[in-house]
Amino acid sequence: MSDANGPTARFGIDNTAVVKVPVHHGPISDIDVSPDGRRLLVTNYGRDTVSVIDTHTCRVASTIAGLSEPFAVAMSAADPNYAYVSTATAAYDAIEVIDVVTNWRIATHRLAHSLSDLAVSPDGRYLYASRNAVRGADVAVLDTTTGELEVIELAAAAGTTTACVRVSADGRRLFVGVNGPNGGGLAIIETRTRTDGRRVGGRSRLVGTVELGLPVRDVALGNDGNTAYVASCGPVVGSVLDVVDTRAATIVSTHKINEITGPLTRMTLSRDGERAYLISDDRVTVLGTRTQDVLGEVRVTKHPSALVESPDGNYLYVADHAGLLSVARLPSGTAPAAPCSGADEDDDATSGWLPELAPWEPVLA
C-alpha cells in the first residue's frame, strides 16, 4: 500500500479466476469465517437456514435448518467450533448457539427487543448483541459460560436504534453505531474486562458518544487499537467515511466518497487494516485507510450483501442477494492462484465432507 504522501496503489481482482459457490437458499444477509479459515457461515434469512461452506473445496458442506429468519452471525476467534446466530420470530428474537462441527443447535437464548448485530469478545467468553426497542436502544451482554445477562443502556428516547456493534482487540471497549432523529453517532462503552478475560467489579458503562451528521451504516476498528472507521450515508450528501480517534473520542478526518453512487450498506476492513471494503447496491468500493483514497472496485457479483477476508488475508469472500458466494484471490495474497482445491465454477453439488469431530464442551448454560 502507499504512504500518505506517496502515490496511491491501485487494487484489482482477476475476475476470470473467481469461483462461484451457489448456496441455493435465497438472499444472504451475513457471513463470517472461522478463525482457522476452514469454514464459512452464511445466514439465509428467507429460507430459515444457515449454510456451512468448506473453504478448501468451495462447496456447501452442510445446511442447518429450523432457524427462524437468521440474520447476524459471529464466530469466536478463540474457538472455531461454535457460532452465534441472531434469529427473529413474532414473539421474540433470540441468539442461537451452533456447534459447526456437529451441525447441532446446542442452545437458544431468548431476548427482548429486536437484535441488530452480534460481536464476540476476543476470548470467546462474552457475546454482545445490539438491540432496538420501541423506546430506545441498548446492548445485551451474555456470559457464554454462565448464561448471565447484562444490559447496557444507550438511549431511552423513541426513534433511537443501533446499527452495529464492534469489540476492541483487547475486549475492554465496545463501539456501537447508533442512529436517532438528529443523526448518527458512535457510542463508546467500557466493558470492565481485564486483560486476563475476567471482569473488574461494577458494570459496563457508556463513556462517550461521537456525534455524526449522517445515519451510521457500519463501523470497523483499526489494527492500532485507537482508530474507528465509521461509514455513513444520506440521500443528499451520499456516502461518507469518518475516522475517529477512540482515545480522544473525536473525529480526526472526514472523507466524502463520490465514487459510491448508490446506498452504502456495509463496511469491512482487510486483515492488515490497510483497506476498507464498502458495500453499496451494485459494487464493493475499496479505500486505502491511510489516505481514504479509492483504490479500486470489486465487481464479482451484481448485488453484494456481505463480505469477509480469509484469516490469512489471501482470499476475499463476497456474498450477494441472489444466494451466491464469490471467492476471489486477493492481489496481495501469497497463496496459489486457484482459490479452491477441486472446485468447479459450474459445479453446484453439495459436498458430504465433515471435519473430524472434536470433544463436545458446553458454551452457554
Label each region the model flagged.
Residues 1-365:
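Predominantly soluble domains enriched in secretory-pathway, periplasmic, or organellar proteins
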